[in-house]
Amino acid sequence: MEIIPAIDLLDGACVRLHQGDYDQVTRFSEDPVAQALSWQSQGATRLHLVDLDGAKRGEPINDAAVRAITAALDIPVQLGGGVRSLERAEELISCGLDRVILGTVAIEQPELVQELAQRHPGRIVVGIDANDGRVATRGWIEQSDVLATDLAKQFSAAGIAAIITTDIATDGTLAGPNLEALRTMAQCSAVPVIASGGIGCMADLLSLLPLEPLGVTGVIVGRALYDGRVDLAEAIAALGEARLQDVTAVAADIA
C-alpha cells in the first residue's frame, strides 16, 4: 500500500483544514517546495497536492507553487482542487503533473471526465469527497444528493486511473479512517481506491492493510505527518513489514 503525503496549498502556503472548514486553518510551512522535497527525501513515492483556493474559487491561485513543486521533484505529483474544464486539466498535465484529480466536474460534467480519461489514459483520477455517504462539491461547500458509491460505480468503467475517497467527517481530525465506508467503496469500484481522511497514528495505517486485497491500494496522509504523529519513513517500512506478519500484532507493537 502506497503512503502518499499531502500538501494543501492556500495562498501559496502549506496548510491543513479541519473537516474541510476554511475557517479552521493551520499553517505548517510558507515554503511548499521545501516541504515537498522533505517528503521525497523521506521515501515518498508520490505526492498529493490540493489547491484549496482553486477548490473554493475555481481559480488557479497556486499555479506558481504547483509548477515549482513539480519541477523540483523526481517522484510523480498529483493535483486536485478547482479543475473544472478540459483546458485546465490539459494545462496541468502539460506542466508535468502525473495525475489530475476531478471532483466537482464528476458531478456537474461527467462527460468531461470520460473524455479526459480517453485522452489521457492512466492520468485522470476521480475524487469522491463524501459526507454521510453523499458527495460534496466545490471545496466541500456544497452538498449533493449523489451517493458516493453510485459515483464510484459510474466511473469505474470510464477508464480512470483510480478513485480517491475522502471522508469529510474524519478529515483533519486524526480520529482514524472510516473503514466501513472504505470497504464499501472498494467493493463498488473496479479501479484502485486511495483512502484519505482521519489517519492519526501508525495503527490507523496498519488498519487499512486488510482492505488492500479489495482494491484499497494507497492512503493519503496529511496532518498526522505535520504533527509528528506519524514518521513517513517509519510508516513506509512498517507497512512493508506488516505484509509479512500478523497485522494486529504489528499494530500492537507500534501503538
UniProtKB/Swiss-Prot annotation:
Active site: D8, D129
Main location as per UniProt: cytoplasm
Reaction it catalyzes: 1-(5-phospho-beta-D-ribosyl)-5-[(5-phospho-beta-D-ribosylamino)methylideneamino]imidazole-4-carboxamide = 5-[(5-phospho-1-deoxy-D-ribulos-1-ylimino)methylamino]-1-(5-phospho-beta-D-ribosyl)imidazole-4-carboxamide
GO-annotated molecular function: 1-(5-phosphoribosyl)-5-[(5-phosphoribosylamino)methylideneamino]imidazole-4-carboxamide isomerase activity
InterPro entries the UniProt entry points to: Aldolase_TIM, His_biosynth, HisA_bact_arch, Isoase_HisA-like, Isoase_HisA-like_bact, RibuloseP-bd_barrel
Entry's Gene Ontology BP terms: L-histidine biosynthetic process; L-tryptophan biosynthetic process
Listed CDD domains: HisA
Top-rank taxon, per record: Bacteria
Organism: Synechococcus sp. (strain CC9605)
Organism ancestry: Bacteria, Bacillati, Cyanobacteriota, Cyanophyceae, Synechococcales
Keywords, sorted A to Z: Amino-acid biosynthesis, Cytoplasm, Histidine biosynthesis, Isomerase
Cellular component aspect of the GO annotation: cytoplasm
Keyword Isomerase: yes
Name of the protein in question: 1-(5-phosphoribosyl)-5-[(5-phosphoribosylamino)methylideneamino] imidazole-4-carboxamide isomerase
EC numbers: 5.3.1.16
